[in-house]
Amino acid sequence: MTGSDYNNIIIDSKESIKMSEKLVLIDGHSILNRAYHGLPDLTNSEGLHTNAVYGFLNIMFKILDEEKPDYLTVAFDVHAPTFRHRMFDAYKGTRKPMDEELRQQVPMIKEMLTAMGIKIVEKEGYEADDILGTLSVRAEKAGMDVAIISGDRDLLQLATDHVMVRIPKTKKTGTEIENYNTADVIEKYGVTPKEFIDVKALQGDTSDNIPGVPGIGEKTAGALIAKYHCIEAVHEDAENVKPPRASKNIVEYWEQALMSKELATIILDAPVDYEFSDAKLSGGVESLYTEEAFLLCKRYEFKNMLSRFNVEAPKNNAEEHFVVVRDLKTAESVFEKAKDREVAFAVVPGESLENSESDGQLSLFSEQVSNDYLAVSICFSEEDIYFICTGDEISSSFLDEKLNTLEVKSWISPDLKTNLHRFKSKEIKADDRGRYFDMMVAAYLINPLVGEYPYDAVAKDYLGLMLSSKKDYLGKLDFTQMMKEDEKKAVDCACYEVYTAWKSKPVLLQKLKEMNMLTLYRDIELPLVFVLYDMENEGIRADGIKLKEYGDKLAVSITELEKKIYEAAGEEFNINSPKQLGVILFEKLGLPNEKKTKTGYSTAADVLEKLAPEYPIVADILEYRQLTKLKSTYADGLSGYIASDGKIHTTLNQTITATGRLSSTEPNLQNIPIRIELGKLIRKVFLPEDGDLFVDSDYSQIELRVLAALSGDERMIEAFKNGQDIHRSTASLVFDTPFDEVTDLQRRNAKAVNFGIVYGISAFGLSNDLGISRKEAQGYIDSYFVKYPKIKEFLDQTVLDAKKNGYTKTMFGRIRPIPELNSSNFMQRQFGERVAMNSPIQGTAADIIKIAMIRVHDRLLDEGLKSRLILQVHDELLIETKEAEKDKVIKLLEKEMRGAVDMKVSMEVGTECGYDWYDAH
């Protein structure tokens, strides 16, 4: 029976044929290893590597679907010497150590198999191959059919008419499987399965370091065994063996050949304690898809596997207490009952708000926003979970008033800033902020690598609850649409969100306490939520007419550049097509280039920047790219974000970056270009209200000051204390040049070194940045560390601590996990070390600017000023102020920014004023 026959057996169910029972045996380490190397690296939101486990399960599920076995067992190797090592010390001696990412997944797959109730067998002193061989023989004697699943072709020796060896190949496109019984092995290799051992004895096996006979390769070994059937017969007729070298070596290395045969032979009677009843799938394959395994698949985020599990998420009693409230009397009683309790709340937005959320613009401030609620969901105990709907009796204004005036012990929100916007929160005084809890911000601090913190993820990670996600409940519909289609789904989604927020609060706070981040949460991150809410509400005025004029100006420049490029190329072509551009530059014009790849020539910026100084067409192309990006991203892109109040209300994201920095989206106002004049001019479209002006302050070299303070390097600290130009000072030290004689070029190079050190730059990176040799760049770095020795000590110690702990910390206790430090991939580890060097510096700087934002925002309110903080761009704060308040605001702004932190190095602030953002910057 061939492999194809094996897969195409047809049984007539009408015939009373008793089918043989079937045992599937899986070579655990082999399949895990094959899956690991066959799939790209995968990690879940916890940072766990999962590709090997995922691939293993995919292969196993495919086998189970095809085989539908009665028995199932997985064999694993034990990390200990076997009898083969005692026979031959160098056995498997050439194998590299297992990658750490793969090693971490061995206990994970064992946990998964155990959760599925699958029998696992290991035996010290023997390999998994010996276990598989022993069990296959026992099963065949018991009248079973056997399928052995392995990536190791050594197991082909086990194939019989009732034992099929199946070898999977894992690819991105899926899993392909080769099938071998006796006939298949003979057809493919020209020898029987048992003779396959003798082939290995002659040719050896480099993967297992089985020596074999020198000079005999796969082809010769196969031909000899096909003729003689065993190595003993080959040796007996050695004088007639061809070629002559094989004849000579089979005699000279005969003892080695015998040893190789013994090493290659799988033991069929290993002392394995095993009962078939332990591996019996009494409930069929379906019995493997247990709730425990389902939970692990959810944890590892194997979403496309979940449908296999005919189990529901673990039940909790919460859903039994979800109550929909539509009448005013009941709503009043619910809010009365909630008084003086810890209340989780979320505003379920009305239709117009939700529709605008899907169009890519910032929904909270678009023209279509209405103040209408669909509902408010609240939770204040395990039994008190309500979905209070607007309708004939309950109005949005009623709910709005309750959320703003209800006296509670504390307010809890799954996403506080979003919900403050949705019910248009009245001003919340600084003293009252501590009465609020933000689930999303707390979860972010605990694990800042995830980037998203929906209620179902928080429930899974911190409460052990497997809840359906918002997407699972609503799909592509909004709440209003789902209420019409399936009210229960909409209600369950909204209620589970507030239930999770309410239930997770003590757990998250305890976790923050254990991680020493409770102060960071209470004093910085939570107050910042309210500051960002106010800033987003304020927005920044954008002049649509000026924006169009700016776009028109760019269009003229782009057209002129196109003409220049076409003239230089001698023809018109698509400048935005890398393929066409590559042909023009490197074939038609003959510019020097790197080797052409399958996809064509590289026209990436780093490639073109090297050519630009010598070739004007390349410089024009780079400028063309800059201008077209400016036009599409800013001139054209920003106009869609101007709301009915004439302002752009960006979203300031608090829970996105791993380092703690804020980001800006919808639109991104932190990424306004500053290096080219045409890019900087975009700031001219941003204006204060008539009669007002902008005050703009930014920290001077904040990250270098933080580096000096954290490292305690006296020389750098002294330079800052003396008010020296730090880059000129560094140039003087590194290039051994008197301070007053430092050239502009030396200062520029020193500046690159200063900021490069902050980001853990290598000699290779610095050489590219400065256009110098790697040796010269390394000399700069070495000289830098000689002059600033404590910086070197600090960076080295930071990396060591990060490797030990798995994370870095800022001055204020912010943790940044760095899983890359444990990678078996050298480049990933190098990246992890650079992250470790930079994170405490960049993270501390981010903490400082956040503290400054809170201080400035609160002082403006405390002083009763009309001026407002409206924008933050990394180390820069922008205030819109009245002319009469200008002087007071400047003093206030600089004082609060300088006073944000007490370090060995003072924070210096530069301030400018102007009637548009360009002039103020």
Explain the meaning of each model-derived region.
Residues Y253-G391, W411, G434, L477-E677, ...:
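Conserved "right-hand" nucleotidyltransferase catalytic core of DNA-directed polymerases
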Residues V556, E560-K563, E567-A619, V786-R834, ...:
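C-terminal polymerase-core module
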Residues S377-E382, I446-K476, C493-T500, Q654-P738:
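Function-dense linear segments that define catalytic or interfacial modules
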Residues K172-K200, V369-E514, I524, V556, ...:
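Active-site-proximal helix-loop-helix substrate-binding element of RNase H-like nuclease domains
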